[in-house]
């Protein structure tokens, strides 16, 4: 492949958001170094202007590209939630050590911007105890990014995502699981009360948020956070009922709300304050109803 003069690094490029982001970057004509655990598998599905590499090879590749190409930014999507491991070392490595390696590369090769991906349940005003190691490590790296932004000529951006959904998400995720239950015509799905308010954000809008910040990187402060969501909340119950009614009009509800006890310190309300993101020229194109309809079209 022929690389353009400017490129970005994307970690977690083979994941849910990463795949959508790569397609959008391709359409924008931006070259990408895409970090993945399985280079051979992803090279077989190569996109134009995308060069796949492993975490072990990223430094050598960036050094090679520095001869005639400029690194303009890094988008860090890769993460470890801790669902499949109880090892704090593994979680710390994925959420702090590896992105710090990328941040050092960004400083060394004078990238303009580092976009870090974070989650709504790690907001500082929440005391969410579920996935605590994930939350601790994400907050740790955010502090490191803030420190680096004060010490170096780079913008560090914390992209705090609300509840992202869309085509291509993992089968074990909440919404794909519910869709699978509906497809299998299960008679009962046990839920909590469903009173939690969430800001469901369609993956296309999330990708556009990253592109908007990347395109306007010269206007971004040295450190800032953008909350990526529609700015409007809906209860889990209303979201699930609309999903079922759209998939199976006229069917009886399969949801048994209140059958599962709420977690301690459950987050009952999370909606993005997206004013500063909108000020950069971004706006969501999908409310939750349009998002559900678009998701079902693309399954």
From Swiss-Prot:
- Residues recorded as binding substrate, renumbered to this chain, are 117
Looking at the keywords, is NADP present?
yes
Gene3D superfamilies (alphabetical): NAD(P)-binding Rossmann-like Domain
Q: GO MF annotations for this entry?
A: oxidoreductase activity
Arranged from A to Z, the UniProt key words for this protein are: Lipopolysaccharide biosynthesis, NADP, Oxidoreductase
Keyword Glycoprotein attached: no
InterPro entries the UniProt entry points to: Epimerase_deHydtase, Lipid_A_modif_metabolic_enz, NAD(P)-bd_dom_sf
Q: In which pathway does it act?
A: Bacterial outer membrane biogenesis; LPS O-antigen biosynthesis
Biological-process GO terms, alphabetical: O antigen biosynthetic process
Xref: SUPFAM superfamilies: NAD(P)-binding Rossmann-fold domains
| Active site location | 134
User: What EC number(s) does the entry state?
Assistant: 1.1.1.341
Q: Which EC main class describes this enzyme?
A: oxidoreductase
* Catalysed reactions, semicolon-separated: CDP-alpha-D-abequose + NADP(+) = CDP-4-dehydro-3,6-dideoxy-alpha-D-glucose + NADPH + H(+)
Entry similarity comment: Belongs to the NAD(P)-dependent epimerase/dehydratase family.
Extra remark? The functional difference between abequose synthase and paratose synthase lies in the side of the pyranose ring from which the keto group on carbon 4 is attacked in the reduction of CDP-4-keto-3,6-dideoxy-D-glucose.
Q: What is this protein called?
A: CDP-abequose synthase
């Amino acid at each position: 492949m022929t690389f353009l003069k400017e490129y970005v690094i994307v970690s977690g490029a083979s994941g849910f958001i990463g795949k959508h982001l790569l397609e959008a970057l391709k359409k924008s004509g931006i070259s990408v170094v895409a970090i993945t655990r399985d280079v051979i598998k992803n090279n077989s599905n190569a996109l134009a202007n995308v060069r796949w590499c492993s975490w072990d090879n990223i430094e050598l590749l960036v050094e090679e590209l520095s001869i005639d190409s400029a690194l303009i930014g890094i988008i860090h999507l890769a993460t470890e939630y801790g669902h499949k491991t109880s090892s704090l070392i593994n979680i710390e490595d994925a959420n702090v050590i590896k992105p710090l390696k990328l941040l050092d590369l960004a400083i060394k090769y004078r990238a303009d911007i580092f976009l870090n991906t974070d989650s709504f349940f790690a907001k500082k005003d929440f005391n969410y105890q579920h996935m605590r190691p994930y939350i601790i490590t994400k907050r740790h790296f955010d502090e490191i990014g803030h420190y680096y932004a004060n010490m170096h000529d780079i913008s560090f951006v914390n992209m705090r995502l609300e509840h992202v959904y869309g085509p291509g998400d993992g089968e074990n995720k909440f919404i794909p699981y519910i869709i699978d239950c509906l497809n299998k015509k299960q008679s009962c799905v046990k839920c909590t009360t469903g009173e939690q308010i969430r800001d469901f954000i369609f993956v296309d809008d999330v990708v556009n948020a990253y592109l908007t910040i990347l395109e306007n990187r010269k206007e971004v402060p040295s450190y800032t956070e953008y909350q990526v969501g529609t700015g409007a909340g809906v209860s889990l119950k209303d979201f699930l009922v609309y999903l079922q009614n759209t998939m199976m009009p006229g069917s009886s509800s399969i949801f048994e709300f209140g059958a599962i006890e709420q977690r301690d310190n459950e987050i009952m309300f999370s909606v993005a304050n997206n004013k500063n993101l909108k000020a950069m020229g971004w706006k969501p194109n999908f409310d939750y109803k349009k998002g559900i309809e678009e998701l079902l079209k693309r399954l």
